[in-house]
């Protein structure tokens, strides 16, 4: 690789790190830690009764009535092909705002446990690794190395932008 190409790659990586730096709400799924940009988070609620909706993707648990607004609830464990688990004491629903092709919408994301809000600085962020052509990593913003642990930073718009990823609710 020429020194000019190496400099350009390093500059793009630095720009990516700068653009991703900021506050993230971190949460656990199975044994991994993930992070969401805190500006996308509207609230965190305890698991409540979820109304099952027929003929939706397997990872859509159903809908909830949140102060008169019906929102879809997605089990991220199932969306990420992890083993399904019953709700525990620390299970929570993170209500996030997404900008999808159909418009701006609220979605409840079911997670094992909410951890903390972290201020992630540019030096702690690495670009998403490549795993070959067969693995889609477009939903990952990057990887953060914070306090000796790895956090997978998610772009929930990309997680859910696939056609039919979420049911239409009123």
List each model region and its residues.
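An acidic, low-aromatic, low-complexity terminal/linker signal
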Residues: 1-170
């Amino acid at each position: 690789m020429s020194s000019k190409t190496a400099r350009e790659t390093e500059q793009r990586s630095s720009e990516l790190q700068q653009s991703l730096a900021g506050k993230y709400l971190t949460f656990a799924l199975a044994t991994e830690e993930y992070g969401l940009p805190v500006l996308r988070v509207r609230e965190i609620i305890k698991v409540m009764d979820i109304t099952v909706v027929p003929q939706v993707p397997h990872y859509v648990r159903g809908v909830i009535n949140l102060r008169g607004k019906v929102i879809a609830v997605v089990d991220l464990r199932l969306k990420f092909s992890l083993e399904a688990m019953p709700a525990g004491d620390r299970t929570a629903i993170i209500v996030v705002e997404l900008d999808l092709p159909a418009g701006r919408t609220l979605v409840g994301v079911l997670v094992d446990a909410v951890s903390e809000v972290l201020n992630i600085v540019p030096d702690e962020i690495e670009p998403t690794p490549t795993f070959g052509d067969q693995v889609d990593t477009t939903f990952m913003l990057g990887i953060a190395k914070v306090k000796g642990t790895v956090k997978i930073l998610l772009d929930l718009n990309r997680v859910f932008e696939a056609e039919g990823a979420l049911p239409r609710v009123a």
